[in-house]
Design a protein with these regions (language model features):
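Long, largely alpha-helical accessory region at the distal end of helicase-like NTP-driven motors
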Residues: 2-88
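Mixed-charge, low-complexity interaction segments
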Residues: 50-246
Length: 246
């Protein structure tokens, strides 16, 4: 006759340990049967649960995401939610009413542009911070505003190390405002105008402007939050990547 295993008395902790290992095994089996898109969604919902049901920002999703899943996202741009976060949220019905209004208009196109703009260096980020302006988003930035935002960005931590040929913070501090502005205009400002899908434009009296059609949407809170989140995430990801590569 078959042996009745239920008659064996295991120590309580043994049963618990066995149960937990079995649950882990089932979880691993589940993961393997899921498509990578489903795994990313599952990870999103896990992070959302950690945040007590709050929709994660890009920064929050990055901070709490499983390292292996994040690395996969970085290597597979097609499935990477950080390259098209509003699209990702739209597909899983997680956009707020205000975000849906942005999503259906020109604001989404602009956010998508700054989310995906090429970044060999970090130089575009202080320019975008100049436009963001602590939440009072500008349609154009003057030379002085560019220099102010640029220096504020590179004064922080070791960000100054992004300047080639500058070997110390003291040496960085010797760079003049005129030199900073020249670098900003010859590199990020030039490239934003060239590859900005017509969003970044010349404006009389300003170092750089964005299209007037954005005048209404830049006042919307949801737009401001998205813009800030994109700039913060892209800055952080740039430095993470640089750290890993070095």
């Amino acid at each position: 006759t078959a042996y009745d295993y239920s008659e064996i008395e295991y120590p309580d902790d043994c049963i618990v340990d066995f149960d937990m290992r079995l649950i882990d095994l089932f979880r691993e089996m589940d993961k393997k049967s899921l498509s990578i898109q489903e795994r990313i969604k599952q990870e999103y919902y896990r992070v959302k649960e950690l945040l007590d049901g709050k929709v994660p920002t890009r920064m929050e999703l990055f901070t709490n995401m499983d390292d292996n899943i994040y690395e996969y996202c970085m290597k597979h741009s097609k499935e990477n939610p950080f390259k098209r976060y509003m699209d990702f949220l739209y597909e899983i019905h997680e956009l707020s009413v205000e975000e849906l209004q942005i999503y259906s208009g020109i604001g989404r196109e602009f956010l998508q542009l700054i989310e995906t703009t090429d970044m060999q260096k970090v130089y575009k980020m202080p320019i975008l911070y100049g436009f963001y302006n602590e939440g009072d988003v500008r349609l154009a930035v003057t030379d002085d505003e560019v220099v102010e935002s640029w220096k504020k960005f590179f004064d922080r931590g070791t960000n100054w190390k992004d300047f080639p040929k500058v070997t110390s913070y003291e040496e960085y501090r010797k760079i003049t405002d005129k030199q900073h502005l020249s670098k900003a205009k010859s590199m990020p400002i030039k490239f934003l105008k060239a590859s900005g899908k017509g969003f970044f434009i010349d404006k009389d009296g300003y170092a750089l402007g964005i299209r007037d059609e954005l005048a209404d949407v830049i006042k919307v809170d949801a737009f401001k939050k998205q813009m800030k989140d994109i700039i913060e995430y892209r800055t952080m990801e740039y430095y993470r990547r640089r750290y890993v590569e070095n």
